[in-house]
């Protein structure tokens, strides 16, 4: 029984080492976050609209609350 378990552990270890060396081939580009869902790297800029929707909604609500029709006029 112990020999079977040891044999399986060795086989799985060798298989895991081989598969780990293959890699996924996914490249990750470092990007800078500028707020409101805007990201830029050396090549391009893009918007994460899922994040931007929430941020833009906050801006609209805060603007309405602070400067709505009830706000004093100058």
Curated annotation (Swiss-Prot):
Keywords: Antibiotic, Antimicrobial, Bacteriocin, Secreted, Signal. The keyword Secreted applies. The keyword Lyase does not apply. InterPro entries: Bacteriocin_IIa, Bacteriocin_IIa_CS, Bacteriocin_IIa_dom_sf. Coiled coil: none annotated. Its main location: secreted. Pfam families: Bacteriocin_II (PF01721). Residues 1-30 form the signal peptide. GO terms for cellular component: extracellular region. It comes from the Bacteria. One of its GO terms (biological process) is defense response to Gram-positive bacterium. It is found in: Secreted. Belongs to the bacteriocin class IIA/YGNGV family. Bacteriocin with antibacterial activity against the Gram-positive Listeria, Enterococcus, Propionibacterium, Staphylococcus and some strains of Clostridium, Lactobacillus and Pediococcus. Lacks antibacterial activity against Gram-negative bacteria. This is Bacteriocin hiracin-JM79. It comes from Enterococcus hirae.
């Amino acid at each position: 029984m112990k020999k079977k378990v040891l044999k399986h552990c060795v086989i799985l270890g060798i298989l895991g080492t081989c598969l780990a060396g293959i890699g996924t081939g996914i490249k990750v580009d470092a990007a800078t976050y500028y707020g409101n869902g805007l990201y830029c790297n050396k090549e391009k800029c893009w918007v994460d609209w899922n994040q931007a929707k929430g941020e833009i909604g906050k801006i609209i609500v805060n603007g309405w609350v602070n400067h709505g029709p009830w706000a004093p006029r100058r």
